[in-house]
Design a protein with these regions (language model features):
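Short glycine-rich, Thr/Ser-proximal phosphate-binding strand/loop in the N-terminal lobe
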Residues: 4-46, 65
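Short amphipathic alpha-helical surface micro-motifs
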Residues: 13-15, 53-54, 68-70
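Short, well-ordered amphipathic alpha-helical segments that serve as non-catalytic structural scaffolds
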Residues: 45-60
Length: 74
């Protein structure tokens, strides 16, 4: 079974994220707007939208895999 990790890069304009293997090959990637959530009160909505986007991305893969880690950069 392929082992994949989630990578997330939180930027001031967009949050980019993807699924990569141990060799760094990217299997899927996407972005959501970070600017859509300018206030601390928007944080729960940001996390919910990011979580939904990650679930969608993971469901697009057409093979079995194991999530073994997550990395977040900001």
């Amino acid at each position: 079974m392929k082992k994949l990790a989630i990578g997330i890069d939180i930027g001031g304009i967009n949050t980019a994220f993807g699924l990569v293997d141990e060799q760094g090959e990217v299997y899927a990637e996407s972005v959501i707007s970070t600017r859509k959530y300018p206030f601390v009160e928007d944080y729960p909505s940001y996390v919910a939208d990011l979580s939904e986007a990650l679930h969608t991305l993971c469901n697009e893969l057409q093979f079995e895999y194991e999530l073994v880690g997550i990395g977040i950069g900001a």
